[in-house]
Each structure stands twice: as C-alpha cells, then as structure tokens.
Regions:
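Anion-binding and metal-coordination hotspots
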Residues: 1-178
Length: 178
C-alpha cells in the first residue's frame, strides 16, 4: 500500500507498465471520444515559429502546468514579453501568479467561459448572477424575481493545491417560494 501511494505522488492514477505516465483522456479515434490511456502532457513554448522551451508533465490538465512552465522559462531566460495560451490555462491561480510575479509581461489568456459569456443565450439567462441588477453603493444584487441578496462576509477558501481564493458572500433576504 505504501509503495503504491509513493508511485501515485499527488496523482489520481498511474500506469502499471510506466509508473511515470498518468492516465489521460486522449482524442485519437475518429469520433474524438476521449479514451483513458497512459500519457504525458507535453508543453511547448514558441517565438517567431521557433521552439524556445519545452517540458513534460504528469498532470493531465494544462491549468496546473502553466506556473511551473513559466518558472522554467524564467530560469532559462526564454520568457517573451507576451504570454499567449488558450482557455485551458485560464485560472485564478495562473492569473494571480502572472499579475504578482510577471509584472513586465502581457498575458493573453482567456478564461474558460469567456466565449460562452458573450453569447445571447448566456446574456439572457436569468440564473447567471452576472445578469442580475447590482447596486454598488449598497453592495447588493437583485435577482429577476426581486429577491435581494445582501453582502454578508468576505471569505477565503483554500483548494487541494493550496491556492487561496478570496471572495464575497451574499445572503438572500427572506423569500416565500409559494
């Protein structure tokens, strides 16, 4: 049991034939169905169509590879002025790292729901808090049913990767569902 735990090393899976590989969803069949196969996550940085840096990670998600990859580029002095990546790299922890540590760089990384938020369907969805009326002076939201959500407290949450998020908590005033 302890040996198996040691092989896992902060992962959810590993291959019995290649302990360094992690099971990842790969889209290699014609229907693009994601099948779990032992794999690695390759990251490549380019500038002017030349490869300036690369690294291989056991982590299946791009979100958690960005910070170590940027640190490697800083160490190798290969980080360009612009940091360009797709929405798979967009996360609060990545944005905060770039804002705090890489103040001379310009990040061009959309967040995961950016394109959806620009759609007519999203903008007309009354369940989305961003579509509710907000009063900045008194710090409250009004939902489409007229229920008022008042500011309650500042909160912090730390995820399993030790990233702490700061957010505001709102509480609904009494509401009769009938």
């Amino acid at each position: 049991y302890q040996e198996t735990n040691k092989i896992f090393d902060n992962r959810n899976s590993y291959s019995k034939t290649d302990h360094d590989a992690t099971f990842m969803r790969v889209k290699e069949d014609p229907m693009l169905n994601g099948q779990l196969k032992p794999a690695y996550n390759l990251q490549i940085a380019t500038s002017g169509q030349f490869i300036t840096n690369f690294d291989i990670y056991q982590n299946p998600t791009d979100t958690r590879t960005l910070i170590p990859f940027l640190n490697k580029q800083i160490k190798n002095n290969s980080l360009g002025k612009y940091i360009v990546a797709d929405a798979g790299y967009g996360s609060e922890s990545n944005y905060r790292f770039i804002e705090d540590k890489l103040t001379n760089n310009i990040p061009l990384i959309p967040y995961g729901t950016m394109l959806k938020e620009q759609s007519r369907k999203w903008k007309s969805d009354d369940r989305k808090v961003m579509n509710w009326y907000y009063n900045a002076k008194d710090d409250y939201y009004l939902d489409p049913n007229g229920v008022r959500f008042n500011f309650n407290a500042y909160c912090k949450r730390t995820d399993k990767h030790q990233f702490t998020r700061d957010f505001k908590e709102y509480e609904a005033e009494k509401y009769d569902i009938n």
